[in-house]
């Protein structure tokens, strides 16, 4: 399947099943610890570097922008993304979720920071993703099933994508986002405008001091 022709491609075993399982267990542990920290008021409910449960796209589901382990995957997977898309890419950000029973990912297209994206299956119960390779809206779409370690590469700004209601218990996915290198806009948007990968969104536009470079 050609990404250049279809604007999407499925890559089996993009990372090993063992690595996917490690990251999946790590992220579930982080979710559980975060819940205790928030509920005990050990940390502020507005603290985002432990993840959130108030994501508007999938409410009441544990989600995390820029987790350091996921951002490391963002770096590690980039050469694979470049090989299979034929594009030179720059990292923008990662976003991970552990979906729960009843969750739905509504049909949508992405914004510029998600120009070239992948959804990487970390583990849990099966939950296919759908996308419409025609670039139109409201089409039946193509059903894509991923096993742990598999990923779907897609042009997020061009192709509508979604997931229907989840009937399993949980499912761990991480979205890894990139821009095509070459434009002024892409250069300005590098790392989603953060000075370093792994920093929360609060650091967009921030400048590092000499002591932190």
Predicted features and spans:
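Catalytic core of non-heme Fe(II) oxygenases with the double-stranded beta-helix
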Residues: 101-162, 170-174, 179-195
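Non-heme Fe(II)/2-oxoglutarate
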Residues: 1-85
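Fe(II)/2-oxoglutarate
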Residues: 1-4, 201-206
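Conserved double-stranded beta-helix
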Residues: 54-60, 73-130
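Mobile, glycine-enriched helix-loop/loop "lid" segments at the mouths of ligand-binding/catalytic clefts
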Residues: 192-204
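A short, polar/charged loop/turn motif at coil->beta-strand junctions and beta-hairpin connectors
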Residues: 2-5, 90, 123, 170
């Amino acid at each position: 399947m050609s990404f250049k022709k279809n604007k999407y491609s499925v890559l089996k075993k993009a990372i090993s099943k063992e690595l996917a399982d490690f990251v999946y267990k790590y992220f579930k542990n982080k979710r559980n610890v975060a819940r205790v920290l928030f509920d005990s008021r050990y940390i502020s409910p507005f603290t985002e570097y432990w993840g959130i449960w108030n994501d508007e796209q999938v409410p009441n589901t544990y989600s995390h922008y820029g987790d350091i382990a996921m951002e490391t995957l963002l770096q590690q997977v980039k050469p694979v993304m470049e090989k299979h898309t034929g594009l030179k890419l720059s990292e923008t950000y990662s976003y991970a979720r552990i979906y729960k029973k009843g969750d739905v990912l509504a049909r949508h297209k992405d914004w510029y920071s998600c120009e070239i994206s992948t959804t990487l299956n970390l583990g849990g119960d099966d939950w296919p993703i759908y996308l419409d390779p025609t670039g139109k809206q409201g089409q039946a779409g193509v059903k894509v099933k991923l096993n742990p370690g598999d990923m779907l590469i897609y042009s997020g700004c061009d192709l509508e994508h979604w997931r229907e209601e989840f009937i399993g218990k949980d499912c761990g996915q991480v979205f890894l986002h990139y821009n095509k290198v070459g434009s002024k806009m892409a250069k300005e948007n590098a790392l989603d405008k953060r000075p370093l990968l792994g920093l929360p969104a609060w650091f967009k536009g921030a400048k590092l001091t000499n002591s932190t470079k």
